[in-house]
């Protein structure tokens, strides 16, 4: 990264806690199929990794916006289910299972991002720059 460069980061985050996505049991399908090896960062995650970069500015976007986005994606998916199932069939053996995994994923995201009026999980943007 050149000295005067800036980095813009867009993440989903939790208001307080960062946590790893680790499969807990056989029912933990969302972690297994969508988030394996991932992390849900906390809103202040970059404050803990500030050796090389510093946060110039940050913005939090209320989770209700992403809830509405997820709802719209589900509506669009249902409207185009035939084409989407063909696409899934090209990539997965079990197209219907994957179609319904995605449906439940969108439904879950819609609900999770509404919790606490969109203030529990939300989108954050960060502008970072190299430390001097």
Feature-to-residue mapping (PLM):
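Short conserved AdoMet
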Residues: 1-2, 50
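Short, well-ordered loop/turn elements at secondary-structure boundaries
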Residues: 2-3, 122
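Conserved beta-strand signature within the Rossmann-like core of class I S-adenosyl-L-methionine
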Residues: 3-13
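Substrate-binding/catalytic lobe of Class I Rossmann-like enzymes that use SAM or dcSAM, i.e.
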Residues: 13-123, 129-132
